[in-house]
A protein has these predicted regions:
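Divalent metal-dependent catalytic cores for phosphoryl transfer on phosphate-bearing substrates
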Residues: 134-160, 288, 300-302, 306-308, ...
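Single conserved hydrophobic/aromatic residue that forms the stacking wall/gate
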Residues: 681-691
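Acidic/histidine metal-binding catalytic segments
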Residues: 111-122, 178, 435-438, 479, ...
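Hard-cation-handling environments
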Residues: 670, 674-683
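Non-catalytic interface/linker regions that flank or bridge core catalytic/transmembrane domains
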Residues: 2-128, 135-137, 141-506, 575
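Proline-centered turn/helix-capping motifs that create local helix->coil transitions or kinks
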Residues: 484-491, 523-530, 604
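Structural motif corresponding to the C-terminal cap of alpha-helices
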Residues: 108, 112, 431, 525-529, ...
Length: 691
């Protein structure tokens, strides 16, 4: 592999290797990340001192590997000092990658494959796509490249592309690449939404600028134009499938920072759609277009910066592209981000509460934004479906707007602050989703959930009806929680919002666990679990007090996160809160008792031998009445099932049922009936316990 005569090859200039910074701020001085002047000098000297191109190429790989490692260390060190400066970090990794790719391109173009007078067909443009195209790179993000030619790829272009890729692979970069003509891009983009999304984010890196400009013009003229409805539909469907794959919950305690619900991909989907519709280039244009309000955009930026910071720290900690915030990484990530123990809570718990708070904000923003777009731009439902669809009867001051519940006049609506509560009940009654404008009205007027409202008898009635009247209270509670209305109406609920439980047992945050428990109670009440939960189902069917049950579940973990037994503290809090929800004195006492002892039945059944008469006797003495036993049994079942998808199993069911039946027999017939011989239950064998 001989080299051309040195006199025929121009020297490389530093300016040709420097990416355009524009207004981008890096986390460190650009020359500390990649010094183009020093590398240019190295190239010119190295070329003069090597006898053949292979030696020249090998020396370049060694030097670029050293430079990249030093640049990564510089970014990491600066990030350690400023652990929340995520925007500067992801731009810095992009700058480093751009510098390397521009350098490799010029090496190949000038020295490895020089063409003194290239023809029109021998033009090549290097395009960044995907996250790299957005200038958003974590330490170990993929580098997605499009090698673009005006027409069919020529032998020269093939040689250049091959040389570029082999050098980048030798540098251990994870490259995703394609070589296409402009017509190829248009054809494949029409067929594949993933390719179309990548092309939406294309960015010129180096090479022939005219070819890149031609692609951009043709994309907007021939591909993106007049296809917004299809694109939005595809992105919304893609989002739903992604959420389902990641567990379907925003509050999974080991979340995926990139793909999970409330993660970075949700924010990116929002911007993709805005860009597709309005050709926006900067996020700030979302406010100018009226797609987000200023305060929503501030939340957007803060959440995005936080999530990117978490993702970058994860990559650094694991030395790979890791996006799953698993238990073993949460402590180290919290430490890297500067969190400390506070008010009896571990640093990791404070960190994760912040994480879920930001994830909730992402949900608020994307829901409002995407729901509005879905209503405006997605294809209408088929004619027959529209004709035969049941239109619910709507009460004043509400209306149906784009098949969602909204209000006729927001000024009139806000004259009565109880309407903020009535909105959620009306949504349950009609089965309609709440329109984004109505959700914005709730968020913007949270201050109306004041002391007077909490003491208002009508407000108490509305909230209790939410819980017990419509059969699916979890829908309203989850939406209230996400909008901040639940904690505004019950301030004692605020500390457990987005609260992480740092153990392997719980799958959800405390607030989401609470709502899951209420969802299970509603399923039992709707008689959907008769075969699986015969005792709990019969208790509900026989007329158990639903006001007590739903209130107890809503408040059962409200004492968590403090330096005190959460059952004891929760019972004291419930004594104050339950009357505000409209419960009478006797009901309040029962709720207080249930919360104080909401772990008792589970502990007795799973930690003691229920074939021992003393276990049943002790439990019966604590419970005292069949009514309490019934209520505690239902509460226990819902609490266990609400922990996670697989926490309820046949072994636990057998234990709970046996303890219930034996205790009920004692409470009805007296302690003299309690002998080991009359107990029909025997402890499970070791094999049964494993099963």
């Amino acid at each position: 592999m001989t080299r051309p005569n040195r006199s025929t090859i121009p020297a490389c200039e530093p300016s040709s290797l420097k990416p355009d910074l524009g207004e981008i701020e890096l986390i460190s001085a650009p020359e500390k990340i990649f010094d183009a002047s020093k590398f240019t000098s190295f190239l010119n000297i190295c070329y003069s001192n090597t006898s053949d191109l292979k030696s020249f190429r090998d020396a370049i790989v060694v030097e670029l590997r050293r430079i990249r490692k030093a640049g990564m260390i510089e970014i990491d060190n600066s990030f350690t000092k400023n652990p929340l400066s995520a925007e500067q970090v992801i731009r810095s990794y992009t700058w480093l990658t751009d510098s390397i790719i521009k350098s490799v391109w010029h090496i190949c173009k000038i020295w490895l494959h020089p063409v003194p007078n290239p023809t029109q067909a021998e033009k090549l443009s290097i395009i960044a796509v995907g996250g790299y195209g957005r200038k958003e790179m974590a330490p170990y993000s993929d580098v997605d490249l499009l090698f673009l030619t005006p027409y069919k790829t020529t032998p020269w272009a093939e040689s250049v592309i091959e040389s570029i890729l082999y050098i980048l692979w030798d540098l251990k970069l994870k490259i995703g690449h394609s070589s296409r003509s402009i017509s190829d891009c248009l054809r494949l983009g029409k067929e594949d939404y993933t390719i179309r999304t990548a092309l939406l984010e294309q960015r010129f890196v180096d090479g022939d600028h005219a070819t890149a400009k031609e692609l951009e013009m043709r994309l907007w003229k021939d591909l993106f134009k007049l296809t917004a409805k299809d694109f939005i539909s595809a992105k919304l469907e893609e989002r739903d499938l992604r959420h389902e794959k990641q567990g379907g919950q925003r509050y999974m305690v080991e979340p995926n920072v990139k793909e999970g619900k409330g993660g970075l991909r949700d924010l990116q989907s929002l911007f993709w759609i805005a860009k597709y519709l309005h050709h926006v280039k900067e996020q700030s244009e979302l406010v100018d277009l009226g797609m987000l309000r200023k305060e929503e955009f501030v939340k957007f930026q803060k959440a995005e910066n936080f999530l990117w910071a978490v993702r970058c720290h994860l990559h650094i900690l694991t030395n790979r592209a890791s996006d799953q915030l698993s238990f073993d990484l949460q402590v180290e990530t919290a430490e890297r981000m500067g969190y400390q123990d506070s008010k009896g809570r571990r640093a990791v718990e404070v960190f994760m509460q912040d994480y879920f708070t930001h994830a909730t904000r992402v949900g608020d923003i994307t829901r409002i934004f995407l729901t509005a777009l879905e209503a405006q731009h997605v294809k209408e439902m088929p004619l027959l479906q529209r004709i035969f669809r049941r239109i619910p009867q709507i009460k004043d001051p509400y209306t149906v707007l784009q098949n969602r519940l909204s209000v006729k006049s927001f000024d009139a609506f806000l004259e009565d602050k109880l309407n903020l509560l009535r909105l959620f009940e009306e949504a349950l009654r009609t089965g309609l989703l709440i329109h984004p404008d109505a959700m914005r009205a709730v968020s913007a007027n949270i201050s109306l959930f004041d002391h007077d409202m909490r003491q208002n008898k009508e407000a108490q009635r509305i909230f209790m009806d939410l819980l017990i009247k419509h059969g699916n209270p979890e829908r309203a509670l989850r939406r209230m929680n996400e909008l901040g209305a639940l904690a505004a109406f019950i301030p004692e609920f605020q500390p457990i919002v987005a609260m992480m439980q740092f153990n392997m047992y719980h799958s959800y945050t405390v607030d989401e666990h609470t709502i899951q428990c209420i969802s299970h109670l509603a399923q039992i009440e709707r008689e959907e679990l008769i075969e699986e939960l015969p005792i709990a189902s019969s208790i509900l069917k026989s007329g158990a007090n639903k006001r007590i049950l739903y209130t107890s579940l809503l408040l059962h973990d409200i004492g968590k996160g403090q330096n005190e037994d959460h059952s004891v503290l929760g019972a004291r809090i419930a004594r104050k809160v339950a009357p505000r929800l409209g419960l009478n004195k006797k009901e309040v006492e029962t709720v207080e008792w249930l919360i104080r002892y909401h772990l008792l039945m589970s502990d007795m059944a799973q930690k003691r031998d229920i074939a021992d008469p003393r276990t049943v006797r002790d439990f019966a003495k604590a419970v005292q009445t069949v009514n309490r036993l019934d209520l505690l049994t239902v509460l226990t079942v819902c609490d266990i099932r609400g922990v996670g998808p697989n926490t309820w199993n046949n072994w636990k069911a057998v234990l709970i049922r046996a303890l219930y039946r034996q205790t009920k027999k004692v409470l009805e017939n007296g302690y003299e009936a309690l002998t080991r011989d009359c107990l029909l239950y025997t402890s499970p064998s070791p094999r049964d316990r494993v099963q």
